[in-house]
Regions:
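Cysteine-centric segments in proteins
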Residues: 25-111
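N-terminal signal peptide c-region/cleavage motif recognized by signal peptidases
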Residues: 19-23
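Bacterial N-terminal signal peptides that target proteins for export
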Residues: 1-11
Length: 111
């Protein structure tokens, strides 16, 4: 293998690693929950399906795990453990950043 090919291959690997690490980083967002209203938060993608976690100092941490396209189950962490939220969340047709739980009439958004 020539030095140029080795350098090119190493550069491609480094770029792929950088792109992957950036996508997994937490991002600043504006959040809304029915219980807490609007607040500045941190958004972090959890997996490739679209599951995510939102958190902020002084607020509970919320996790939505995608169950299928447009459907998710939620958890809230109030300190030491995740507590399952009742019912299933449905992605909003009006705003794709929002999820609605028709069984509990609650809403969670992250922009």
């Amino acid at each position: 293998m020539t030095l140029n090919k080795m350098l090119f291959g190493g550069g491609v690997c480094a770029a792929a690693l950088l792109a992957f690490s950036i996508s997994a980083e937490a991002k600043r967002a504006r959040c809304f929950t029915s219980d807490d209203g609007y607040f500045a938060c941190t958004y972090r993608a959890i997996d490739d399906a679209g599951s995510f976690r939102i958190s902020a100092p002084g607020y509970p941490t919320y996790v939505l795990e995608i169950d299928g396209p447009g459907f998710a189950y939620g958890y809230v962490n109030l300190g030491r453990r995740n507590v399952p939220l009742p019912g299933q969340f449905v992605r909003s047709h009006d705003d794709g950043a929002c999820w609605y739980n028709p069984q509990t009439n609650t809403k969670l958004c992250a922009w």
